[in-house]
Amino acid sequence: MNSISKDKGNIYILKAIAIFSVMCAHSTPLMDSNSKINVLSSQILDYLGTFGVPVFFCISGYLFAGNTRAWGDFWKRKMFTLFIPWICCETLLWLYVMLRKGGISIAAWLLFLLEYHHTTYYLTILVVFYVIYWKIRKPCVIWILNIVSMLSMVQTGWSTGIFYRFNTAVDSCYLNPFNWMLFFGIGLLIHRQKERESIRKLRDRQGILYR
């Protein structure tokens, strides 16, 4: 099995694990009951549901690091693979919600598309990362952003500090890019490390050939 096929296989496995985790996260509470088995099951599902989105961001960072398209070509492709499906699916879901609850307006539609208080906030943050990391290539800069991200997560958990205030400003810790930056950065760094290993192996082979 070549490295590309192995990469694809590993990514599919990670995606399956992440999907399972997201399903667990949205399966609680199991029922309106205080029985011990229900409480325990809900806690287990909560724990299993904590790593799905981080894994997806790691995968996205890894794949983004391998991008070779120019700025215009990249976003042209994303128009068809990301934005059009996103807008169509979210608009249909929004119409369903509005038919049940009312409150149709352009502002409500735009906020819904941007995942404001909505479960698919992942796409909004992903687009933000594509812009932020477009020119960032040096591992040292990525590490600095990872450290900033860890600080943001700590402050979010402790409900204090500038990043917690940022959460309050956007009215959701899920829409704070700094809370997710670490995982996207890890994906970038893994890809950078694989690139360095590939270059080293290639040089070793060339050295053997020319001895």
What residue ranges belong to the model's regions?
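Membrane-cytosol interface segments of multi-pass membrane proteins
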Residues: 1-158, 202
